Design a protein with these regions (language model features):
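DnaQ-like (DEDDh/DEDDy) 3′-5′ exonuclease domain used for proofreading
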Residues: 1-25, 152, 156-194
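Conserved non-catalytic scaffold segment of RNase H-like nuclease domains
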Residues: 1-112, 126-148
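Short hydrophobic beta-strand that contains or immediately precedes a catalytic carboxylate
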Residues: 9-10, 115, 215-217
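Short, glycine/acidic-enriched loop or turn micro-motifs at the edges of active sites
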Residues: 14-16, 94, 119, 156, ...
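A residue-level signal for conserved active-site and pocket-lining positions in enzyme catalytic cores
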Residues: 59, 88, 153, 157, ...
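Extended, hydrophobic interaction surfaces within ordered domains
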Residues: 61, 116, 120-179
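Conserved beta-strand -> loop -> alpha-helix junction used to position metal-binding or nucleic-acid-contacting
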Residues: 109-122, 242
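A positively charged, amphipathic N-terminal helix/segment that binds anionic biomolecules
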Residues: 165-242
Length: 242
């Protein structure tokens, strides 16, 4: 699978779920190329207090970040590390949204090919209902030294990828990956085949949330185009699937 010879498995920890309001506090990368495996990690100073919930989740304290670099200090090094690689992350919309915003603030446009391993897991194992990282650890017997630390979680995503490579036929898997990468902006739980069936005609559409409660009703002269437009931008997303 030549197209997938250069991969960057990425995880971030943040002060919250909004890529516009919150800040990155830790980044971990496992870069896999034909030259081998390279790991990269950095804490970041968010210049704001870490919420207690985040401190308890990650174990990262405010005092640890006081002397950490700003994102601007590591941006060029990180950008160079990620350039030319497929960006692989668990619930990739979350990590990508934060990183695109952070790079944009320092004048860099970050627009990689993206592979979400939540969507990959759903595609490869549709018989399971849960595809968060803890479920993958249990299901695939992944080894972990800790959870909710950036480099440790990036290593877990890499481990899952290694399991996938040994479990599935290479030619078939390559087609699956190409399809997923071509539609990276869709939410991890949304079936692309369902979206593909939408007509390009006038009509009304309805989004449902949990417990089948309606969230949004819209209308358009082109249903498919309009529904897809809801997912074309970078969205805030919680770490529910991580």
């Amino acid at each position: 699978m030549k197209r997938f010879d250069s991969l960057a498995f990425v995880d971030i920890e943040t002060t919250g779920s909004s890529c516009n309001r919150d800040q990155i506090i830790e980044i971990g990368v496992v870069r896999v190329t034909e030259m081998g495996i390279q790991e990269w990690h950095s804490l970041l100073n968010p210049h704001m207090q870490i919420p207690l919930m985040i401190k308890q989740l990650t174990g990262i304290s405010n005092s640890q970040l006081e002397q950490a670099p700003d994102f601007a200090d590591i941006a060029k090094e990180l950008f160079s590390l990620l350039t030319g690689c497929v960006f692989v992350a668990h619930n990739a919309r979350f990590d990508l949204g934060f990183l695109k915003n952070a790079f944009k603030r320092v004048g860099l446009e970050f627009a990689p090919s993206v592979l979400c391993t939540v969507r990959l897991s759903r595609t490869l194992h549709p018989q399971y209902s849960r595809h968060n990282l803890d479920s993958l650890i249990e299901r695939h017997r992944l080894s972990t030294e800790s959870r909710h630390r950036a480099l440790a979680d990036a290593r877990l995503v890499h481990q899952f990828w290694q399991r996938v490579l040994t479990e599935f036929d290479e030619e078939w898997l390559s087609q699956v990956l190409i399809k997923l990468i071509q539609h990276p902006s869709l939410p991890s739980h949304l079936d692309f085949d369902l979206v593909k069936q939408l007509p390009q005609t006038p009509g009304v559409y309805l989004f449902y949330g949990e417990n089948d409660l309606p969230l949004y009703i819209g209308k358009s002269i082109n249903l498919k185009q309009r529904v897809m437009s809801h997912f074309s931008a970078d969205h805030r997303q919680s770490k529910e699937m991580r």
